[in-house]
């Protein structure tokens, strides 16, 4: 009897042991799936947090860029840029900054001189097919010495610079004075731009050195209407202004 009870007892123990092992195996097989699911959930949460932080950062950077642009635009509009001219002394080699002349410092003679210089540069540097060969050329002639005038004729007769070939009847130009600098009693440095009125509407920035004098002239009545005081340019040089 003892052997019989011992057999059933050992059988029950064997079944219990096998059942326990099976439960442990089921738990072990279930744990990797749960761990994997938890890892994906944590990873997804981290990605969402990172995305939200990135969106906030982009918004802050956009606001900063807008504010910076507005500040720069305000500073540029409120800041005044005045061109300056450096004059070199031919004897000593010393450099000096030439101060531009303000309107409050102008005398009557200087105002008159600036008027005639502007009139001269306008006639010489701008183009209008209506009066280029007549009034403009006559103005340059009456305001120039013979040497300066013939130098002008040689310039405009060059095919590379002749405005009648460049613009023909299709375009005109106008002058805008940017600054005046008086570097001697009879000499000015003038910064200006020549602006096209149509087509590409290009702008050509230039700088001219103009020396002048007032001399007695024998002129006709019609010529006196153009140059009534004997204003004469005895030196003229113009270059592109890249400043």
UniProtKB/Swiss-Prot annotation:
Its main location: membrane. Disulfide bonds: none annotated. Keywords: Membrane, Transmembrane, Transmembrane helix. The keyword Transferase does not apply. One of its GO terms (biological process) is protein secretion by the type IV secretion system. SUPFAM superfamilies: NTF2-like. CDD domains: VirB8 (cd16424). InterPro entries: NTF2-like_dom_sf (IPR032710), VirB8 (IPR007430), VirB8/PtlE (IPR026264). The keyword Transmembrane helix applies. It comes from the Bacteria. The chain crosses the membrane at residues 55-75. One of its GO terms (cellular component) is membrane. It is a single-pass membrane protein. It is found in: Membrane. This is Uncharacterized protein RP289. It comes from Rickettsia prowazekii (strain Madrid E).
């Amino acid at each position: 009897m003892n052997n019989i009870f011992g057999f059933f007892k050992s059988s029950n123990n064997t079944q219990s042991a096998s059942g326990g092992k099976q439960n442990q195996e089921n738990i072990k097989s279930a744990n990797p799936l749960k761990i994997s699911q938890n890892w994906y959930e944590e990873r997804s949460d981290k990605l969402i947090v990172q995305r939200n932080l990135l969106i906030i950062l982009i918004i802050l950077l956009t606001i900063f860029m807008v504010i910076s642009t507005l500040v720069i635009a305000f500073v540029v509009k409120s800041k005044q840029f005045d061109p300056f001219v450096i004059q070199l002394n031919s004897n000593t080699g010393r450099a000096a900054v030439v101060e531009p002349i303000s309107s409050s410092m102008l005398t009557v003679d200087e105002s008159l001189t600036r008027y005639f210089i502007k009139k001269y540069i306008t006639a010489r540097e701008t183009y209008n097919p209506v009066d280029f060969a007549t009034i403009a050329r006559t103005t340059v002639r009456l305001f120039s010495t013979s040497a300066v005038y013939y130098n002008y004729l040689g310039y405009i007769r060059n095919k590379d610079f002749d405005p009648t070939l460049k613009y023909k009847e299709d375009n005109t130009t106008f002058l805008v004075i940017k600054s005046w600098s008086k570097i001697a009693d009879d000499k000015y440095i003038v910064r200006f731009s020549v602006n096209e009125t149509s087509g590409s509407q290009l702008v050509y920035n230039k700088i001219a050195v103009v020396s002048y004098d007032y001399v007695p002239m024998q002129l006709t009545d019609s010529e006196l209407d153009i140059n009534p005081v004997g204003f004469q340019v005895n030196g003229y040089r113009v270059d592109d202004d890249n400043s």
